[in-house]
């Protein structure tokens, strides 16, 4: 039987009994289940007895083992207590040993100090004796003229002197030793010069060793610099005596310096410990010792060029220098970790320093150059058509000059001259706007827009208007190119000079400005050639202004700036003047007719209608010639304004939207024409006509009954013309015609609600009691 299932967690009695019966003998299935059950019960009872016996035996063994475990625990406890006592005793022994040892060590330390002092005293006595011995032998040694032996003696004396610092005659010994070193240097100087001149590596190494041991390396390097500097200075003087232009002379000098750099680096690397520093100082000293000096050469070269070309010539010289600087930068780049950055910065200053005075006054030079260049762009010509054409051509010339100025600023100052550039550009734009304005005034005079001849015949001439439209298109091109140029200017300034802006800079904050200076000094250590900054030290005010410009561009974005806001406003005013010119050229003919109205004799002269009857119907009257001319002229306006609608000219469209027309719509009027520029112009001219017409009518001194009807007829005609063009007649014009048509006896009633001054004036003209 399988009794293991009794141990299962999911044991089920019924399932086990059923399984036992299924697994039983066949007799159980044949009906002898009772006997099989009795067998199972008997087996279970036997199994229970076995289990009880096993449990009893296990319990008995456990009871027997318990006293032994308790005895073991007690023994372990006693051993732990004994161990604790032993550890306390050991701890006390250690403490006692430490006390005894510290006293012994203190004695040993004192003994060692005494020993050290005695050794030092012994060494001092030995060195003093050695100094005396060497001093006595040095004269004999000098007679041998053996530099190595003399150097060894002097080195020994120098070492001895270091031990004699506290002796009374120490200073005298120092002076004596320096005098001996000077004698050695004087003795060796011819050989030193010969070694450096012939580029003898072995001899040069020997002298480096000797002079290093006697602490005279600066003096040895002075011989090196002098030997090679003489050769380079002679090459420069030879170049200066040629007929070559200065930029070619500079190129020759820089080629010689760069060649010397590469040759000397290769040689010095085998002789000196810090060859790059040595050759860097050689170039610095050479550039500073040139005769004639570079500042003098630049000054004379600029003066010879004259005011017209001084900036151009200066840039030619600067290009040669910048090319040399780039060559040096590339030569130094592979050995950046070996360089003394302070020396490299001194070299950068020596290379670019001669240009600093010109860079600081770059703005003035640029302004002068731009104005001279622009003086060759005349806008004024005899014929109007030539003026218009020159104005159109001048746009590209203006922005060509401006873009070239930006190129020069970046090329010559790396963006540090931005403030001067902006000033120069403002002067250029101011000069351009002034000349453009003068040309517009000249065109007005040629068309006699400000001096209307009243006695001239009425005739349509649209030439002036067409030319004015071309000028408006030119203004639009000016505004468009100005916006593009300003965007490009901001981007180029930020990309070029932005490297000088410190992250800690805060506008109008002294602390931020000082932090930015420190940060810039740190950043200059990265690459002095790229971070050269002449402005920060020599013109801090201008540098602060530049930082504010860069900060604004960076914070607000290069598209949201006001670098040329004054110039842009001036160009907008030019566009407004061009609009006024175009408007006046159209309105001139109308105004010419309207100004005749107050002076017409027909208003106070009795006509045929007066002699017949006052009750003639108004349709029997026809508009007078002056109003007929005006009406026909206005009706022809849409045809001549058509270019505004049909011409696809983005510049013209820009200018038209930027400009403002005179005689804006009255408040409360519907403005359907605003969506169409041609209708906008037509509306403005119509309003100008009606307002001027009203002003002219109110200046008529007297009206007869007949002329009153005639004037009302003329006004009705003009109103019909306006209706035909889809335009609203002005309220003033409607009020006047209403007052003119009113019968004398109804005048007071009709005038109610109308402006009192208007009603009084019309009543006076009609001689109506009011």
UniProtKB/Swiss-Prot annotation:
InterPro entries (UniProt xref): COG7
Topology in membrane: Peripheral membrane protein
Major place of residence: Golgi
Keywords: Golgi apparatus, Membrane, Protein transport, Transport
Cellular component GO terms held in the UniProt record: Golgi apparatus; Golgi membrane; Golgi transport complex
Signal peptide: none
GO process terms (BP): Golgi organization; intracellular protein transport; protein glycosylation; protein localization to Golgi apparatus; protein localization to organelle; protein stabilization; retrograde vesicle-mediated transport, Golgi to endoplasmic reticulum
Subcellular localization: Golgi apparatus membrane
Similarity comment: Belongs to the COG7 family.
Subunit structure: Component of the conserved oligomeric Golgi complex which is composed of eight different subunits and is required for normal Golgi morphology and localization.
Task performed by this protein: Required for normal Golgi function.
Protein name (database record): Conserved oligomeric Golgi complex subunit 7
Origin organism lineage: Eukaryota, Metazoa, Chordata, Craniata, Vertebrata
